[in-house]
């Protein structure tokens, strides 16, 4: 089948991967000081970090609108057998709901809820590209992707809780205590929601190495074809610690390093279980 794959910009795939697999993105809206920007097009993560570091308020995001999805689908639906769009998890945004409403007007368009974000969603997007050439039907392809969404593991390790405080997800007192105790919370996406699963203590580079070991070592059920290291601006020693730990415990055929987009400000390792 000739299947076009599109996705929300939250998948955090690199420009090289987007070009390699002919993936087209639907940008979410980033709102900074009352002005709207297109994620990854008219604003970059570095601009957001610089804005907050200078004392600015935390930026917010808005879902892709029904009209924007309709415009995207109309560009490709007439020139392919089918189109599959993979959204950020429905527990994080209204994108899935809006995409489904837009897809109702296109008989050959399907929408898949990744139940994830960042390159956790990106895994599902790349699987859609891998499977599209061998798919017997559009619905069959989507069923395979929906089964996969429960097997993608996405987690990340926070260095500081400043952004969590600004976003109202953590109290100032709790953040102060965590910073004083040098605690680094590990947050995992489970069943389409984020939750703290463990706390590490010590220098960030050391915590990152232990975190990767815990995620990968002694895990025979992991698929070893692809892993993402997804990060925000970081000290070289921290990224080196992650690379070394992934090399030691991962043994993945492909390891992609990607910068987190405007929606995610964290370090992540993301992979798939069998």
Model regions: which residues?
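Short, contiguous strand/loop micro-motifs
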Residues: 1, 59-60, 86, 160, ...
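Mixed-charge interfacial surface used for oligomerization/domain docking
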Residues: 4, 10-24, 28-29, 35, ...
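Short beta->alpha junction loops
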Residues: 63, 114-115
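Class I S-adenosyl-L-methionine
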Residues: 35-105
């Amino acid at each position: 089948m000739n299947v076009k794959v599109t996705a929300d910009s939250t998948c955090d795939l690199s420009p090289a991967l987007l070009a390699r697999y002919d993936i087209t993105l639907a940008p979410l809206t980033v709102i900074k000081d009352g002005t709207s920007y297109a994620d990854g097009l008219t604003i970059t993560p570095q601009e957001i970090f610089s804005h907050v570091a200078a004392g600015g308020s935390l930026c917010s995001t808005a879902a892709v609108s029904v009209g924007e999805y309709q415009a995207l689908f109309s560009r490709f639906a007439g020139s392919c057998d089918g189109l599959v769009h993979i959204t950020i998890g429905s527990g994080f945004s209204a994108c899935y709901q809006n995409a489904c409403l837009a897809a109702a007007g296109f008989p050959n368009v399907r929408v898949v809820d990744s139940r994830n974000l960042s390159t956790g969603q990106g895994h599902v997007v790349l699987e859609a590209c891998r499977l599209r050439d061998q798919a017997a039907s559009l619905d069959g392809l989507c069923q395979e992707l929906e089964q996969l969404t429960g097997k993608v593991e996405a987690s990340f390790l926070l260095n500081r809780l400043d952004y969590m405080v600004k976003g109202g997800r953590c109290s100032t007192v709790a953040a102060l205590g965590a910073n004083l105790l040098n605690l680094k919370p590990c947050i995992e996406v489970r069943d389409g929601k984020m939750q703290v699963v463990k706390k590490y203590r010590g220098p960030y580079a050391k915590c990152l190495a232990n975190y990767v070991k815990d995620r990968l070592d002694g895990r025979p059920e992991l698929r070893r074809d692809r892993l993402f290291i997804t990060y925000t601006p970081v000290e070289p020693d921290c990224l080196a610690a992650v690379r070394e730990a992934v090399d030691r415990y991962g043994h993945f055929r492909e390891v992609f390093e990607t910068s987190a987009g405007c929606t995610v400000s964290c370090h992540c390792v993301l992979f798939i279980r069998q």
